[in-house]
Amino acid sequence: MNDTVLILIRHGETLWNTQLRMQGSLDSDLTPEGESQIKALGEWMKEVPFDYLYCSDTTRAHKTAEAIRKFTGHNLNLDKRLREKNLGIFEGLTSEEARERYPETFQQFKTAGASYVIDQGESTQQLLERSLDAIEEIMDLHPHKVTVVVTHGGVVRVLMKYVLGIPLDSPTQFLISNTGIFRLVWREKWIVAEMGGVPHLEKVNNYSV
């Protein structure tokens, strides 16, 4: 019997990524580099056997998933539970701008932990709960299949911490590159088979890890 496999992929590079702006539930356009990344990803995924394709309903994730669908022909399923963390009043700002505009709130945001709910936004714990809700539903729908999920850095981070048993409040970080690939295999528990690989970017100009 085949394993149940989940392939998490972060979206391509956006303008706000390059400006270090907090995107959250908002969107910004893919950069020319991001467009190159998703094209390379799509071509690469053409050679990767998988059964189902899901993505966040944000434009950056949708465009990235569409680049895969273009080469593979899979139906695309959008799920708003796979969105990036809602960063509320900080969305669209750099960390420096947020610190200057909301000094007390920004300090709380940085120190209060995973249960802290940003004004007009959500907590990291809430992000994990809705992301897990989506992933568990996908796995129940498609047991013993390979499912690709195009999502966001924050979603990948909390899911990987959950899988690895790392507390959400831990400062542990992972390199989650744009279009980075994380492969999980279910064998009574999640096994990490790939951690942020970007083999498809070897031919993209100026790319370096």
For the regions a protein language model found, what residue spans apply to each?
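Short beta-strand scaffold positions
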Residues: 55-56, 129, 150-151
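Active-site signature of alpha/beta-hydrolase-fold catalytic machinery across serine-
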Residues: 67, 158-162
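Acidic, low-complexity terminal tails and accessory targeting/binding regions
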Residues: 1-5, 88-99, 140-145, 161-209
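Short active-site segment of divalent metal-dependent hydrolases/proteases
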Residues: 14, 155-156
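Active-site-proximal alpha-helix that buttresses catalytic centers in soluble enzyme cores
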Residues: 13-74, 78, 122
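Short, conserved phosphate/pyrophosphate- and ester-handling motifs at nucleotide-, phospho-/glycolipid
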Residues: 11, 152
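Phosphate-handling substructures
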Residues: 29, 70-130, 185, 191-195, ...
